[in-house]
Amino acid sequence: MSVARIGRGAALVCSGLLAIALAAPLGAAAQAPSNPSLNAQLLVGARQGDLAQVERVLAAGAVPSSRNRLGKTALILAAEKGNLAIVEAMLKGGADVDQASLEGVTPLMAASYAGAAPVVQRLLAAGAKTDVRDRMNKPAMVYAAGQGGAAAIDALLASGIDVDAAYEHGLTALMWAAGQGQADAVRLLLARGARRDLRDDRGLTAADIARQTNHLDVAEAIARP
């Protein structure tokens, strides 16, 4: 699936476009060849959540950095499914915690999108970088705020990310969460001190963005002192 470029104007915060922009890099994994090598078996095991297979082929010499046709490693496949056990196995086996897919999606971004807070925490503990951006210029926090939810956001904030950091087009995490109607994420961000008065490069606040995307309850929660 191609990734739609996030434009300016009201369509920027449209729920559909945000979902496409976030979800496209996380498409389905490639099918394994009919006579899979150890590396292919590693990818299949990670995709299917088969810890025993992952551990077996790693011990037999599978390369942790092996990638499928989308450039996804076994660590990314495990992270986007929130499979902490396989994430642990891959890290123990020497996987690069920041190796990205062809779309620039890192394991941390994949876990953040999935809302897999335990995996986010484990990747951060392993040294995953929070400031890396994908080919659409989105860091892990945008994946968490736009889709992953409060627990993933909280894990990222605990690593020291500024709650009011502005990303592409001046959008903060609060604005992304508001545009997607992520009420729990909005409440969490406000509780962590996110500013309601900040504006994106169109002059819109998070509450304005929530209204544009018809998330009126979220807009009200943001506007409420």
Predicted regions: what is each one?
Residues S2, G27-A60, R69-K72, K92, ...:
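Intrinsically disordered, low-complexity regulatory segments in ankyrin-centric signaling systems
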Residues V13-A24:
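Bacterial N-terminal signal peptides
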Residues D50-L58, N83-L91, A116-L124, G149-L157, ...:
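Ankyrin repeat structural motif
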Residues L190, R196-P225:
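Leucine-rich solenoid repeat scaffolds
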